């Protein structure tokens, strides 16, 4: 229960990272988004950056190569963000850069997923 909420929180924070990813190998699912971003939840709620967080962010960035994948990831992240309380969106906005991933927009739960390309 708490793990599910934590996973959803991380997904919301990394919404924009996945949305703008340039490379992919397979279709994105909400389960994939949740599992890859689960290690980031503690950090987004004020704790230390977990060891697997950046690896998950990079993997999702690489997997979201197509517009449909990026839109799916975006919607998964927004759903997760709405389900988890206590996310520090300032930390979320800085997380991609900390992990060496560049995204051309701000991370926000209000991102219009239909406008993602």
Swiss-Prot record:
SUPFAM superfamilies: Bifunctional inhibitor/lipid-transfer protein/seed storage 2S albumin (SSF47699)
CDD domains tied to this protein: nsLTP1
Keywords on record: Disulfide bond, Lipid-binding, Signal, Transport
Signal sequence interval, chain numbering: 1-26
Source species, domain of life: Eukaryota
GO term, biological process aspect, one: lipid transport
Similarity comment: Belongs to the plant LTP family.
Protein's name according to its UniProt entry: Non-specific lipid-transfer protein
